[in-house]
Design a protein with these regions (language model features):
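Short, flexible segments with low predicted structural confidence
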Residues: 3, 27-30, 66-67, 78
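Thiol/selenol-based redox catalytic cores and closely related redox-interacting motifs
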Residues: 44-136
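Local sequence-structure signature of Cys/Sec-based thiol-disulfide redox active-site neighborhoods
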Residues: 10-35, 39-47
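N-terminal amphipathic/basic-hydrophobic helices that include classical n-h-c signal peptides
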Residues: 1-8
């Protein structure tokens, strides 16, 4: 349950995906808590990446935004593996087996049958999601 900035109570179902030792994930979880928002945390390291969730993220956010090419996991890949990532299917296959390569956090904002996916810490967008629900 979240308290929106206009003082009304909102009840979005928030699932935050990431890894617990990631600084941006820690910051994001603290920010949600400061807003009075409970959320479910899905740990990539322990729980993996659900294929249906990954498909939704790719459809909404795009594989290019999800794939963290600046992170350590990407830089440690050999050049052949990096070069093989050229479309949604190849990127999704890599993200399924190496979830640390996904830009974090990924958040699903749900209200009824509506869902919105955001990638990375984006306070202005998050405030809109809290105020208006997924249909921002």
């Amino acid at each position: 349950m979240c308290l929106a900035h206009d003082g009304t109570m909102k009840h979005p179902d928030i699932t935050l995906y990431g890894i617990p030792n990631c600084d941006t994930v820690k910051k994001s979880r603290a920010w949600l808590s400061a807003q009075g928002c409970g959320h479910h945390f899905h740990d990539f390291k322990k729980q993996g990446v659900p294929a249906d969730a990954l498909a939704l993220w790719v459809a909404q956010a795009g594989w290019e935004k999800l794939l963290n090419r600046k992170g350590t996991t990407w830089r440690k890949l050999d050049l052949v593996t990096q070069a093989a990532v050229s479309d949604a299917a190849s990127a999704s296959a890599l993200m399924e087996v190496q979830p640390s390569i996904i830009k974090r956090p990924v958040i699903e904002w749900r209200s009824g049958s509506e869902v919105r996916v955001t990638v990375g810490f984006d306070e202005p967008t998050w405030l809109k999601c809290l105020k208006n629900g997924p249909s921002v």
